[in-house]
């Protein structure tokens, strides 16, 4: 699964330059010349993406009208002589079009946003985006006869409608990714329409697109949340790490140039600025391919692909190997300089260079692990600057930096050991118990969804070679925890979760690992209704039966978050005995009515609830 791989690879999707040449804090300029124009863009599809993502509940007819109106506005404001690929920032005009359609803005609860101006208006619209709005059902591909007929009658409208349906269901998905997957879908249609078994063809091929959509959408939402909550400094550190691993033979200045453009393009993509998101992404991908000799030996085949496929290919390309001649470690990287005498700007530059050098020497480490090492190194330098012998202090401390890698390796080994012993289902149950204790405020479906992803990640990562398990597991955990933190941002869960989500990006996963029980949680009064058993427990099979058992497990832990492992094992054994006794008899319902309350009474007495 793509999301199991370190999510930070998505940072290579797009890089950009601003409408005016921009520089970072160290005076390093953007790579690209802002006077260069990109290829002609399909503004109809881009405008459709914008309106479908910002007004998700709008009908296709309503979106099409707004698209037509905004294109008229753009043509008037840019003039016929200006190429479509050189559009200035049109974001305010797009938002104004939504507000101009008062019936639409009022109908879909956006009138409060329209009463605001400029940045406040934009932020209000962004806040209204919902990852899974309940009013929009999951997308279903029409049966082949209908799809093939519609495609043949008007291909452009058919594909534009598909783009609309995808964009409204994935409001955080970057425009280039939507267009790339739509292009893939466009290739599937004629093939499957000619296939002997069109239904099977569509089901098989579109399932891959659906999976890619879901995973890419989660990645993009995750990236935007990281940028929003941890700010540009953390985002730059993340990007320095990933780019230094991906392009390990590039020099530091080249990496810094790329980092500058990464930050800008992701800011625009997260803002929903579809025009710049696509246009600048195309430019930077062209630049990367023109600089293969100094960047990477792994992207030659990618650079032969069409521009929309190019980005996804580079994302999945292997990291370049460790350059020859690099020293194995970075001992005394500071030399004899006094770190505390550096200015804030000098400290940032020094740490960026340390992160660059460390990352290109450790191309298989997960990004959060590298950042934990870098954070630990900075804390070490600040401490040693106060000591009588700074160099000796550094020498001892640098050896201790390995603890961050060792902690992550130990967790990966422990998780994979549990997976091998328990299997995916029982490993999920272990995660369920742990996370119900950490976050008992979550609903049973939420707990089951989060822990199912954890167990699936373990099943995937633990099949890999040992040297790849760490990066796989840390990357997956970072994404899942990121989703949990987005959930906390929407509706606060508890102080412990809040602390882990906001204090340090690098230490988010270790923080969650160290959480045990939410001591602020007060269980609701015992309700026998949550522990009534019926004969459907005997009739259920597979996933349905597992879900019923997990529901019981969650309710049990929520009733007593401090439950010990021994107590839990005893209750589960009693529960299994109840199932065996009642399901083997003829009067199953009567058995549950008689024996169920006995089990609950025994459990309550044992747990003191």
Curated annotation (Swiss-Prot):
Tissues expressing the protein: Plasma.
Residue positions binding Cu(2+): 22
Main location, first listed in the record: secreted
Location relative to the cell: Secreted
Disulfide-linked positions: 99-114, 113-124, 148-193, 192-201, 224-270, 269-277, 289-303, 302-313, 384-393, 416-462, 461-472, 485-501, 500-511, 538-583, 582-591
Modified residues (Phosphoserine): 115, 344
GO molecular function, a single term: metal ion binding
Keyword Glycoprotein on entry: yes
Glycosylation sites: 251
GO CC, alphabetical: cytoplasm; extracellular space
SMART domains per record: ALBUMIN
Entry annotated with the keyword Protein biosynthesis: no
Alphabetically ordered keywords of this record: Copper, Disulfide bond, Glycoprotein, Metal-binding, Nickel, Phosphoprotein, Repeat, Secreted, Signal, Sulfation
InterPro entries xrefs: ALB/AFP/VDB (IPR000264), Serum_albumin-like (IPR020858), Serum_albumin/AFP/Afamin (IPR021177), Serum_albumin_CS (IPR020857), Serum_albumin_N (IPR014760)
Pfam families cross-referenced by the UniProt entry: Serum_albumin
Domain Albumin: 19-210, 211-402, 403-601
CDD domains in the cross-refs: ALBUMIN (cd00015)
Signal sequence range: 1-18
Quaternary state and interactors: Dimeric and trimeric forms have been found in addition to the monomeric form.
Family under the similarity heading: Belongs to the ALB/AFP/VDB family.
Purpose: Binds copper, nickel, and fatty acids as well as, and bilirubin less well than, serum albumin.
The protein's name: Alpha-fetoprotein
Species this protein is from: Canis lupus familiaris
Lineage: Eukaryota, Metazoa, Chordata, Craniata, Vertebrata
Gene designation: AFP
